[in-house]
Structures are given as structure tokens and as C-alpha cells.
Amino acid sequence: MLSLAAKLVAFFWRTADTPREEAGQLEPELAEGDTKLKTVRGVVTRYCSDYGMIDDMIYFSSDAVTSRVLLNVGQEVIAVVEENKVSNGLKAIRVEAVSDKWEDDSRNHGSPSDCGPRVLIGCVTSLVEGAGCISQTTYFSLESVCEGFEPCKGDWVEAEYRIRPGTWSSEATSVKPLRYKRVDKVCISSLCGRNGVLEESIFFTLDSLKLPDGYTPRRGDVVNAVVVESSQSCYVWRALCMTLVKRRDAAPVHEATHFYGTILLKNKGDIEVTQVTHFGTLKEGRSKTMVIWIENKGDIPQNLVSCKLAGWDKSKQFRFQMLDKDQMCPVVSFVSVPEKENSSDENINSLNSHTKNKTSQMSESSLVNNRGISPGDCTCKGENGEKDNILSRKQMTEPEPGGLVPPGGKTFIVVICDGKNPGRCKELLLLCFSDFLIGRYLEVNVISGEESLIAAREPFSWKKLKSSQALTSAKTTVVVTAQKRNSRRQLPSFLPQYPIPDRLRKCVEQKIDILTFQPLLAELLNMSNYKEKFSTLLWLEEIYAEMELKEYNMSGIILRRNGDLLVLEVPGLAEGRPSLYAGDKLILKTQEYNGHAIEYISYVTEIHEEDVTLKINPEFEQAYNFEPMDVEFTYNRTTSRRCHFALEHVIHLGVKVLFPEEIILQSPQVTGNWNHAQDTKSSGQSTSKKNRKTMTDQAEHGTEERRVGDKDLPVLAPFTAEMSDWVDEIQTPKARKMEFFNPVLNENQKLAVKRILSGDCRPLPYILFGPPGTGKTVTIIEAVLQVHFALPDSRILVCAPSNSAADLVCLRLHESKVLQPATMVRVNATCRFEEIVIDAVKPYCRDGEDIWKASRFRIIITTCSSSGLFYQIGVRVGHFTHVFVDEAGQASEPECLIPLGLMSDISGQIVLAGDPMQLGPVIKSRLAMAYGLNVSFLERLMSRPAYQRDENAFGACGAHNPLLVTKLVKNYRSHEALLMLPSRLFYHRELEVCADPTVVTSLLGWEKLPKKGFPLIFHGVRGSEAREGKSPSWFNPAEAVQVLRYCCLLAHSISSQVSASDIGVITPYRKQVEKIRILLRNVDLMDIKVGSVEEFQGQEYLVIIISTVRSNEDRFEDDRYFLGFLSNSKRFNVAITRPKALLIVLGNPHVLVRDPCFGALLEYSITNGVYMGCDLPPALQSLQNCGEGVADPSYPVVPESTGPEKHQEPS
């Protein structure tokens, strides 16, 4: 039974032999008109700044040099040479220096491809027929893949590769999985469409799964499998092959064989049925009729038992009537569907009077049954006399007179479509004859009137980039130096520039393989390549940012005056396109005249919506007479330079911090006794209603305020006391009786605070793993306060990736009411405007203007980037005893290192708080992402053995080593029905519902819920995605209109009215955000927040509406036309964990089912009976019975709630 799996395992490490002769026959591609290119090896005999000679025969320019090794006279090189047809001279178009390493490894001193193969560890990023790419750039053919392994996008592989000298690209010669294992007797826990999951942790897809002949996987089957490491949405393993161990006892009713294919649609029994059954485009509120003819071309009469609808369309937009053969065929017409019961007769279908009379008669006939059924509800005889399991006998109706179609006779059905649900829709019409069944798809595309308000204003066209020739045209440019920008701080500026290497820039711009510049990228991250690898990734991100900014450059712009300053209007600035900040540099150029242009350097001093105030050379400001100017945006490299600087200065932290393996226990920092009576009182089951509310508010909003008296603070003894008593008081603050400032923390939160305070494993980073709504920030606040008061020698640096997160920490510490004045300071970036800082935080910001003074405060709060300011004033290593990084999962590793470099590697303590399952750092360069810049320091540590989940060793401690990780599991935000799916997909079913029941159950009675007591709606919309103008962003008018309607229903609901400020709309595309805001503005609901997933991280709303936008069902195979960044499990997790009481998801199930996370959400919604809208794909049709009461015992169905219940206090 396991022969297939055994064969795959046996050959996993056997590489297919590839003749070396084939590799040597690869010729460089020739441009049109070239004679021939050849590769030569020689020595540089002359080298100047912009050109050189090889063997005094071959000329090359500096642009042709692609090696990262600096060229010198006498340097051995390999060059691709072409011959000039006119002069017969030789010119090198690419020159690569031969490094010493290559010379040592090379046997015959040939080209780089002749050197020993190098090893690449990477992820398969693309696959086409017969080939693929690893980490975006390294090509491999399937012939180089080890036998038995069929790679899939997302698989982690180990490959041997060489550099092809003709094209300077890397090509893998051997590919095998990085890690694999065999798992026995595991259960198929989920199967949605063609995707499934084993034991809720191993992904598989039927598109690439190897199976024994005759076996089709089914939910509940017990199987053995061989799995490989692979990044598949929220899963890290992929099943390669699978064999059955034990089949489920019996298939449930809804898993019966589908009969939807060509057999069902095929004409049978000499009966021919109209083939074209598409209603085309129909306006909402209108109706359209269609005649479907049924003709008997045989010699025997055929009995039509019944005609039914399969019930795919939940909106019931289709209805039909069958007329006798002697009746006149009705005229196809368009009519309005009455919106009210007392509508006039003009809104009724205008069939002839005979037809109208017959309608009332036939509506009661057994031949017309407009009741939704599932395809397993009727049984008819097939052509061979066998039973077809399609319609159940209990729903069959006896044939009435007129159901017989004689030989040569005809009858017809009038099908009416009422436009109700915007978007495309498909229904299945079943014509059940006595001996066979014929089906036809009924399709329509319904459009609403509101869609015209947001229709595309102009056709989409790609923005044309300026040609390289235009960018490098000869000019004489005079640079007028502007006065230095005003700075609130006069800091020594010794931060090195870390310029981007020219050869790296050429690799990106000319699309040369990045491994030719930095082969270390192919290696796993380690201490020896740490700095070089991250420096290259930072430069790649900078290059992309610069290229992106160039797309926003403007020409012929006229500036406006505002007093002595000039104002530039930048369209799209309010949406972050481009992203500008105060202090950024812009270049203004006069229009070119006779090849001359004057260039002025300006600085941004103020930003208001799309108006940017500039500070330029005073002479220019006075002389400017509204002449048109060209504007170039520049990338602010300050944060990047600080990251480079940190990479150089964190080396002292060493392997024990950056690559921790062993745990060496140290003596605890605090040895005091905790007030267990306080613990018991705050966490007991009998906590009062007031305390329960306080706990919920504290976990959700962190607004708990508690004024601590003198007895709670470690105050030094009065100076009047004896000296010995004073010394004893100083030496024993660690032994004092400990109490929590926030008494309503739950047990996990208290344990985390105690472990942070103890610091047993310092300097190893301690991780506070905080899933959504579990009170992570509240725990950090308590830990900071405890360290501050228990350790009088401490100096705490609290950082976060964003200003908003840093402000929140500062606000919560301020609201604690326990800190003395001049204890805490908030350090802002120089360019941050004071107006956008909340009032409660402003006093702490004023103390932060003087960096020297700020560095002496006991608690310093800033962003990760701004913590680099302390390097500039010469703060020594060890200045900070504790470094807390909140939302550490959102910071790139180099960014997180900026504050860590200021901490001692011996006695310092690092605390990283965040969730590796939520959004990581924002990285735009695909190359930088492919090589790991998008993985945060927090996430990388969590993947190391010391921090990994181990249920066997630490099952009693939350499955993680309690000395290094504490996972918070009590969720104070969401309803149970909304929490179950993310808990299962991302958090091992460990999240516990602890939210305030009066909040999370407040919308259970909303009249629009498909299932009362279940606050989730998945509304299927088969809309059309579109783009307009030169914007590459997508929008979906049908979904935008549906979002508008839900917002109106909620805001104006009689039974459950929701404030506009309590509703949030999440959509991944800027253009959809823009369109939804237009619609909401028309109905005066502008208080509803509409934004991307990134804008909602860390926030919560009573109601969340998600518009997924993408709806193209025809181009699944092309990432550019499929889900794009929508298929990101971390974005999915953030989106569905924002609501407290209601989640509404709008999307096309035919597209979303291909993503594992959205597929799981669809399965969850259908099984619990909360799916509505368009028809489902055939792969999901079988699940509809689960929502109608036929539940699959292997899949969790959440019981519906009826309202607020008694809330049990967390222990």
C-alpha cells in the first residue's frame, strides 16, 4: 500500500544526471544584427575611471563591469566580447572579475560556469511548463529535479547552481527538497475544492498530489503521506504523495457523485433542448424572459416528469413556467420588478392574456416546481435503464396531462430572471424525464444603478516610463545649493552614507542575476554572512523605492505662493502615492533650454492633504515668476543608513542573541515575593461585575487607570534615617513585596510579567506572543512599570515600528497614573509635526527635543528608526538595561536591530512583543522578499529550535519554553463564531473567548443575518474587476455597491443600529477604497473608515466588512491576474480578527476557493449556513447540505448564540 511513498522516499536524494556537455553548449542570446558573441579570459592591462583594456586588444567601458570585485591592472577577468563590423575591433559587453575563490576552486581556470557548483537555499517562486525559478532569479528545469519530487510554488529547496557566462544568470543543476518527512496515520481534516489539509497542519492540493490508482481523498480518511517543507499560505508543509490506510465508514449524503459535467448537459433520448440559456446583462430591478424549447426527434413519446431548479442561486432570481404546446410562444420582454406590494400593473410582465390565465393554473402544476433542491434529491432512470442519483423520489411529482412530448412534438418553458443580486450568477435547470435527466445552466449578469457612479472614467493603459535614452540625454545642469533645512536638533552627523554599489544597481536595472553580485544571498543566514546579506537586501529595497518614486515625477508644474514659501500640489499624496514626509528632499528643474537646465534643491516643510510647502533657495523664491518646473522626488535614506549602521554595531551581541541555541540561566533580577492574595482576587471565579468590565476594557483598550499611593512605590528611606537603614533600603528593593499595578491581568499575562522581571535567560530575547485581542500591549505596560520600580538601576528603551504604536505605549503609561514627572520621555523624529500628536502625549514629546537630555530619562519611548538618534550623540553600548520592542513582527530585522545595538550583550534584556502570524514588515522589492527581508527578527527567532513549539516537552506551559516565550490565549475582542476559524488556522485552537458578552452579542438579532445568532455573512458576488486610467490598482463596482448597501442597512437598522464610527471596511486595493468612499459620501456615511489591511492592524471595530475585489475566473494560472497579494495568510488573519460582533465578507467564491485561507472561510461559512449570494463552484456545492442541517461530523459547526450569557471570568 505504501509502495508509492516508499519509492518517492528512496529517490528523494538521487539527482537526475545532467551531462556536463549540455551545460557547456549553452550559447548567449544574440541580438538582432549581431554576428557572434564569444567568452574569453584575459588580464586587465589598462584601467581608467570609465574604460579599460583586456590584453591590450579588447576595449570595455565601466558600464560593462558587473562583478562586485574591484578591477585593477593585472586582474584576471572573463568577458563576453563582440566584434565591430565596421572597424573589426573587439569590445567587451560584460566583464566579470575572477575572484581568488573562483581560482582556487577552478580546475581548468575556465569561465565561472566551470567552477565548482555553489549551493542555494531558496523557495520556488514560479513554475512554467518544464521549468521554474528559485528566489525569483535562479532558473531550473524539471530535468534537474531529483526523481520522485515534483516541485510546487512555495516549496523550499536546496539546489546546486552555476553562473552562465553568456547571460550572467544562475542556473540550477540539481534541485531537491530542503526538508521532508513521512507521517503515518494522519486524518484528512479538511477538503475544500481541490485543496485539503492533513491534521490541520499539512496542506495538499489534488493538482500536484501523487495518489494510488483508483483512490480519491475524502474528508475523514486516515492516510500515510510524504511531506516536504513548503510555504503554502498558513501552512509550512505540503503533502507530496498519499496512500490510504482507512476509509471513512460511509460517505455522507452530500459527497455523492456529482453529475454536473458534460453527461448532464448532453441531450438524451432523442430529446433536444435549447443550448443558449444566457440572459446576458440585466439591470437590477428589471426582469427578462427566455423561452427554452424541448423537442422530441425520436419515434417514441417521452414523459417529462418535472422541471426544477437546483437552488444554486440563493437569491432566487430565476423562476419558470411551462406552457402547453398549443399555446402561443410569449414575447421576450424586459419589465421592472415591483419593489413594493402595491406597485402598479405596469410593473408586471406583459404576456398575452391567455398566457396570464395559464400562469395561475400552471403555478400549481406538478410540472412546475420552483423549489430549490440539491442535486442528490431526485432519482431518474438513465439511458441504460440504471438509476441516476440526482433527484430523490420523495420530491418527485407524478406527471400531469400535458407532460408527454410526442414524437416530432415540441414544448417550451418560459424562464423568467428577476435581477436582484448584482454580479454574475449561474443556476442549474433540471429537466427530469422518466428515463433520463437533462440539465441546462441559466446565467445572468446583473448590474445596479449605483455602479454608474463609480464606473471607469477612462480605459486602463500602462504608464509609459521614460526611456533610458531620455533619462541620460546630455544636459548642462547648474546646481544651486539651497540653505540647509531648519532642524530642531543640532546633532553631530557622523552617520555614514552607505552608498548603493553601482554594480548592484546595474544588476537590478539590467535584470542581471543578483547572485553574480552577492553569492552569499544563496546561503542560509548565519553569523559569517549576516552583515553582507542584510546590507545587500537593504540596498535592493532602496533601489526599488527609488525606481518607484521616479514614476511620480512630474513635468511642467507651476508652483503656488504662500507668503514667502512656495507650495506644490501633488495628486495622490493623501493616499500615500507618493509617500512624503517633512524634511524630504525634492529637486526642481527649470525647463530645458538649449541643452541647459537649472536644478534647485528644496525641502518639505509642511504637508496638508495634497499641498506640499517647500523651502528653497531664497533667491529663487523671490525671483520665481510661475514658470513651469519639473519635479523629481528623492528617497529619504535615513532609516536605511541607520539599519546599515546597526548591522555593524550589533555584532557584539553575537550568536547568543542573533542565533540563540543554548540556554544559560542567570540569577534572577528580582527575587521578591508576589502578593498571591491579589492574584487570587483578580483571577478568581467570583470576580465582581465591575472587575469583569475593567478587565475587558483593559485588554481591549488599555484604558484602565489606577492611582498608586506612596506605599506601592519603592521610595528611598528619608535622609533623616540612619545611614545603614538607607543603604539597606537601596540594596533591597528587589526583595520587596511585589504587587501588580493592573490587578485584572489574567494568569498568562502575569506569568509573562514575572518572567520578564526575572530575566533568567538574558540576554536571549524574551518573546511575548500576542494573538489578536489578547492584551499584548497591556502586558508590556505592566512589565515596563514593574522593571522601572523594581530595578532602580534600570533604563528602559521602548520602541515600536510606527509612531502610532509608540504613541499608544506612551499614552497607556501616562494613563497608569503611577509615573513621577520627568520619568518618561517620547522622542520623535525631527520631521514629525506636533499637530498630529495627541494632546496627552505632547508634554512628553517636549522633553524629547533635547536628545542629550532625553537619553538620561529612565523610560524612553520612540520608534525603532528614531532610536538611531542615540548613536549620533555617542551613547555607549549598555546605556539601556532593557529594550522593549512592541509590534516587533512589523519591523524588518535590520530595523529591529537599531535599538538592540545600544544594549549590553552581558546583562541587558530584550523583550520582543508581537504576533508572527500577523502582518510583517512592508517590503516592496520582490528580490528582497525572496531572500528574506520580509521576515522579522521575531518571526525568525520563533522558527529556531529553542523558541519553536514543542507540545511534548512544554505541553503544560503552552507548548513553548516558558523561559523564552509566553503565548497569550485569552481573547477579549471577538464573538466565538468569529474567533473559531483564526484560532484553528493560526493558533492551534488555543484562543479562548473572554470578550464582554454585551458587546459581542449586540448584533445577533440583526434581521439581515442568514442564520440568527451567528454573526458572520459570506456574501458571494461574481462581479467584474476593472482598472482605469494609468492606475494599476483594481476595483470591483458590484462589490463596492454591496458594501454601500450593508453600511446603510447597519447604520439605519431599526433593531440593531450601528454608529458609522463603529464600522470598518477593509479592501486590499487603493482604487476600491476610492470608489467605496465616493459611494459613502453620497449617503453621508463618511465616518466609516475605509482602508487597506495594513491600516487596520492593531485596531478593532464592532463591524468589519471585507471586499476582496478580485473576480477574474479565467486566468488562475497567472499570478498577475489572480489574487495577487490578497493570497497572503497574514493579511487574511489580520482582516478577519478585527471585528467584535459582526463580520461580512464579499467576494467571488469561484476565485477565492483556490486560496487555502479563503477556502477555509468559505467552507466554514457554508457549513454553518451563513453563505448567501451567487452560486458556488461545483467543488463547494456538496457542502451546502451541511448548512442545511446535514453536518459533517469531522467539521466543527458552531452553535448559534441567542444573546448575552453569563460571562465566566478568566482564571
From Swiss-Prot:
Entry's EC annotation: 3.6.4.13
TM region positions: none
Subcellular location: Cytoplasm
Family statement: Belongs to the DNA2/NAM7 helicase family. SDE3 subfamily.
Compositional bias ranges of the Polar residues kind: 345-372, 674-688
Catalytic activity: ATP + H2O = ADP + phosphate + H(+)
GO CC terms in record: cytosol; P granule; pi-body
Keyword list, A-Z: ATP-binding, Cytoplasm, Developmental protein, Disease variant, Helicase, Hydrolase, Nucleotide-binding
Main function: ATP-dependent RNA helicase required during spermatogenesis to repress transposable elements and prevent their mobilization, which is essential for germline integrity. Acts via the piRNA metabolic process, which mediates the repression of transposable elements during meiosis by forming complexes composed of piRNAs and Piwi proteins and governs the methylation and subsequent repression of transposons. Involved in the primary piRNA metabolic process.
One GO BP: piRNA processing
Gene from which this protein is expressed: MOV10L1
Main location: cytoplasm
Pfam families: AAA_11, AAA_12, MOV-10_beta-barrel
Organism from which the protein derives: Homo sapiens (Human)
Protein name: RNA helicase Mov10l1
Residue ranges of the region described as Disordered: 340-385, 674-710, 1192-1211
Quaternary structure, from the entry: Interacts with PIWIL1. Interacts with PIWIL2. Interacts with PIWIL4. Interacts with HSPA2. Interacts with PLD6.
Biased composition (Basic and acidic residues): 694-710
GO molecular function, one term: magnesium ion binding
